[in-house]
């Protein structure tokens, strides 16, 4: 059962990693719900750590989840390698577990969801990164439910 995530990890912060910005969502394993909370700017994939420190301080997550933008054939892309490095940095900086998950279709799904909610399609001025982060986290929550004592 090495793949089982500890029940102690209840509140999870997720990231849709990007070169220009990172979408962020928070979720609860108890309710299996996730909500987009914000989007922070990044310079060539590096976040503003001071800004991120404030968000982590405010939300107090037990763990992190970072979406890996793999190639469609499942192999690592340059961006997924960067996202993996970011995940490792989160763990090192905040001392909390950081997980990664395949997020190949999350941006597409986020755009579809945004369109359903009336998004006009101007993704540069009105990005969907936090919706993508929410979808990434929702997927992770469904794959990692709290374990019940049988």
Q: Predicted segment positions?
A:
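Phosphate- and other anionic-substrate recognition elements at nucleic-acid/protein interfaces
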Residues: 2-15, 19-150
